[in-house]
Amino acid sequence: MSRKARDPIVLPQGVEVSIQNDEISVKGPKGSLTQVLAKEVEIAVKGNEVFVAPAAHVVDRPGRMQGLYWALIANMVKGVHTGFEKRLEMIGVGFRAAVQGSLLDLSIGVSHPTKMPIPTGLEVSVEKNTLISIKGINKQLVGEFAACVRAKRPPEPYKGKGIRYENEYVRRKAGKAAKTGKK
């Protein structure tokens, strides 16, 4: 059972939560998100707090879904209130990025430019041709798109060239040792 899920989720001002049938919907200044609820959890809204508890009919490990849905709802609340952002930096000679309409155009050292469609609900911007900023209200969508962009050219361990998250540590390897002439 999750220890965090024992605490209620406090709703910031301007965020509303509503539950209809098996679906929770969170609305805030940045937009709205919905999530289908599992039968193993019960959600209660009291004032400006949301409580997540295991359902009474669940006998086998009653708290196993409680932590998951607590985290999902907390991320929804944070997303509609402040939003999420992932920043990627491109390191390498000739590496560039540009946003063209609903496409992210990457020049990453291959013979052709790589074009990636930007999912709806995300805002992508490029600074200084090498810094990509991905913003949105859905934490999963922001992280998934950032991981897809990074996967196009992950940083290599010898020179560190590639696409990496901002402030990501890339473990470096030593190159081949120079010939010494000894036999």
Swiss-Prot record:
Output the PROSITE patterns linked to this UniProt entry. Answer: RIBOSOMAL_L6_1 (PS00525)
Which cellular component, as a GO term, is one annotated location?
cytosolic large ribosomal subunit
Q: Which GO terms describe its molecular function?
A: rRNA binding; structural constituent of ribosome
Annotated keywords: Ribonucleoprotein, Ribosomal protein, RNA-binding, rRNA-binding
- Tell me if Ribonucleoprotein is a UniProt keyword of this record: yes
Supply the SUPFAM superfamilies for this chain: Ribosomal protein L6
GO terms classed as biological process = cytoplasmic translation
Write down the superkingdom of origin: Bacteria
Q: Which Gene3D superfamilies match?
A: Ribosomal protein L6, alpha-beta domain
Q: Which Pfam families match?
A: Ribosomal_L6 (PF00347)
UniProt key word rRNA-binding: yes
What InterPro entries does the record tag this protein with? Ribosomal_uL6-like, Ribosomal_uL6-like_a/b-dom_sf, Ribosomal_uL6_a/b-dom, Ribosomal_uL6_bac-type, Ribosomal_uL6_CS
Disulphide bond pairs: none
**NCBIfam families from the entry?**
L6_bact (TIGR03654)
Q: Family assignment?
A: Belongs to the universal ribosomal protein uL6 family.
Q: Which PANTHER family match?
A: 60S/50S RIBOSOMAL PROTEIN L6/L9, LARGE RIBOSOMAL SUBUNIT PROTEIN UL6M
Task: Quote the function comment for this protein.
Answer: This protein binds to the 23S rRNA, and is important in its secondary structure. It is located near the subunit interface in the base of the L7/L12 stalk, and near the tRNA binding site of the peptidyltransferase center.
Subunit annotation: Part of the 50S ribosomal subunit.
What protein name applies here? Answer: Large ribosomal subunit protein uL6
Q: Which organism is it from?
A: Chlamydia trachomatis serovar L2 (strain ATCC VR-902B / DSM 19102 / 434/Bu)
